[in-house]
């Protein structure tokens, strides 16, 4: 876990703003339009320093496409109390036993996956399993969460072991509504709780 934590901690705001790093990408293994292989090739062609393919609830893309430059990642659907959220896991051991119960049973992580509506994933158990698998746990696009108090919401997750928060995210592009928090307020919360700041385009298209 420490290697990936230090690597991602070293990524700067400038890296994200210049498009040199993209830690939130989806392929056809979930609801993206591009193949896993095409995304890897595009990332290389664009000269990305680091990139992660983070399909919903599945690592099948990483299993079937080993030995690429992509950081292993997943975007999990999970509940915390009354709040439905997405947790990004980075740098996980693909063979870790504790993680297996959290993956979708469907090969494509979003296809006919009832868990996306009535998720049985528990945020505390998931974060613990991510750490057991050598990974780091990051709250995705927090401004989309129905949290009346974002500070308390994040504090709860930090007490469970949350490592980071997705600060750099194209809300106008992908999310029609920002719920109760602004992107600027999220960065302040990240600083308050000493969280790793990550970011990505949440790409679902054929082109990065």
Predicted regions: what they are:
Residues 31-33, 63, 83-87, 148-154, ...:
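Histidine/acidic-residue-rich catalytic or RNA/ligand-binding cores of hydrolases
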Residues 194-208:
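Short acidic/histidine-rich active-site segments
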Residues 39-46, 130, 157:
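Generic structural signal for hydrophobic
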Residues 24-26, 56-57, 141, 202-204:
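Histidine-centered divalent metal-coordination motifs
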Residues 2-15, 59-163:
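Extended substrate/RNA-proximal surfaces in nucleic-acid metabolism proteins
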Residues 1-2, 9, 13-17, 29, ...:
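Catalytic phosphate/metal-binding cores of nucleic-acid and nucleotide-processing enzymes, i.e., regions
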Residues 162-174:
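His/Asp/Glu-enriched short active-site or ligand-binding loop at hydrolase and phosphoryl-transfer sites
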